Amino acid sequence: AMRAPALGAEVVGVRRSVRPGAPCPDYCLRVVPQSELDAELPQADLVALSLPGTPETLHMFDAARLARCKQGAILLNVGRGSTVDCLALADAVHSGHLFGAALDVTDPEPLPSDHPLWSEPNVIITPHISGRFSLAKTLDNIVEIFIHNLKLYAAGQPVDNQVSRTTHYVSGGSGGQRLVCGMP
């Protein structure tokens, strides 16, 4: 999303909630609350998903929501496979409503060999590698976060990047490092 404006794209961010007065990232035209998602879909040439797997996001992109997408749009999913109904996605691509899809995650995962998405020429499926955890820098960051959190834990302080068991999102912490994927 951060590089898309350099290619002439306008980026609209969608968040579960938007705090009044919260700054909009430089690369975004605007950030809207999730309640406005369906109004944005008919205008989007590319719908990029990086959602967590929560009860609220389960099949968030079902047949009805995929039908709201712009004719000829592309769906990209690098979050959790459970956010997209993959059979409905296969139908949307096969019918021509969506031009195609790029999926690093699927539901189920791995996708069965007889799943209809495999036979769609405009669908690219990668084996859950978009996070690039194999890069040395990424592994260094993971170790750095672990050591930082271990020190906090040993001191009896809340750790950073802790996922809430209630919301399934990252909750607060010590206020130190907040190395979290997604929009700030």
Residue map of PLM features:
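Short, structured coil segments at secondary-structure junctions
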Residues: 7, 26-27, 119-121
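Conserved anion/nucleotide-ligand pocket segment
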Residues: 1-10
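The conserved SAM/SAH-binding core of class I Rossmann-like methyltransferase domains
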Residues: 14
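A short, gly/pro- and small-residue-rich
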Residues: 11, 64-69, 142-146
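Rossmann-like adenosine-cofactor binding region
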Residues: 17-116
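Rossmann-like dinucleotide-binding domain for NAD(H)/NADP(H)
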Residues: 72, 78-184
